[in-house]
Amino acid sequence: MALAKRIIPCLDVKDGRVVKGVRFRGLRDAGDPAELAHHYYRHGADEIVFLDISASPEGRRLMVDVVRRTAEKVFIPMTVGGGISDVEDFRRALTAGADKVSVNTAAVENPELISEAADIFGSQCVVVAIDAKREPLKPEHEHVADHIFSNDDGEYWFRVYVRGGREPVDLDAITWAKRVEELGAGEILLTSIDADGTQEGYDIELTREVCNAVSIPVIASGGCGHPKHMVEVFKEADADAALAASIFHYGKFTIEEVKEHLAERGVRVRQC
């Protein structure tokens, strides 16, 4: 029997408070992280993801406190990411109570960090976040765009971005997904920058291509505005988990409602 699909609220944390932006811009305050996480835990979340987008050292210290407070009353897997740059950052997050640590920019700049962390803490603790955006294929990218797609507007590829989705790098997202699996990552957190915050649905094509390319679990992220979008990403892209923020933070749907919607449409989920 196939594993149950996971529903994961994402909490973007800045200076100890939860915020949510549209396409990584225009942040809104959505409350206390530990309280929100506990609310989602009680209402059937399968996991929690904290992404720390603080810029200051003080914000980073506040994040450790958030993780510690959350771990005292939330008993589902918790992933922490944002600002992770070395093995000591992994250790700090795990010691505070995280079950998994998500790394993005530092992994692109130093891929050996993935294997180093996996060797020390185990692959199950290592999540590589991949932020990807579809871009028109230009001649200067043909040597790095290993996977090329086309539509009525022409050819395009999925490009990796770092530093919170602000900075493009010459790296094909599907190639990078394969590489992080080889290096020992236990899971991929895949965000479509195009879809993030729009509430118009996940990027099915991007998610499907990455899921087909790797054997480790893939969490789809970016664009969820309705439970039907989760049905699509599970059935059409075969994602292992769906991450969402806006639809939960502002009370648009409860996790119970989402799971009921999925179950009615034949998607296996853990019941609340």
UniProtKB/Swiss-Prot annotation:
Subcellular locations according to the entry: Cytoplasm
MF terms in GO: imidazoleglycerol-phosphate synthase activity; lyase activity
One of the protein's GO biological processes: L-histidine biosynthetic process
Keyword Hydrolase in record: no
A Pfam family it matches: His_biosynth
Keyword line: Amino-acid biosynthesis, Cytoplasm, Histidine biosynthesis, Lyase
Keyword Coiled coil belongs to the record: no
Top-level EC class: lyase
Catalytic activity annotation: 5-[(5-phospho-1-deoxy-D-ribulos-1-ylimino)methylamino]-1-(5-phospho-beta-D-ribosyl)imidazole-4-carboxamide + L-glutamine = D-erythro-1-(imidazol-4-yl)glycerol 3-phosphate + 5-amino-1-(5-phospho-beta-D-ribosyl)imidazole-4-carboxamide + L-glutamate + H(+)
Disulfide bonds: none
Pathway terms, separated by semicolons: Amino-acid biosynthesis; L-histidine biosynthesis; L-histidine from 5-phospho-alpha-D-ribose 1-diphosphate: step 5/9
A GO CC annotation given for this chain: cytoplasm
Active site: D12, D131
EC number assigned by the record: 4.3.2.10
Chain's role: IGPS catalyzes the conversion of PRFAR and glutamine to IGP, AICAR and glutamate. The HisF subunit catalyzes the cyclization activity that produces IGP and AICAR from PRFAR using the ammonia provided by the HisH subunit.
Subunit and partners: Heterodimer of HisH and HisF.
Family: Belongs to the HisA/HisF family.
Official protein name in the record: Imidazole glycerol phosphate synthase subunit HisF
Protein's gene: hisF
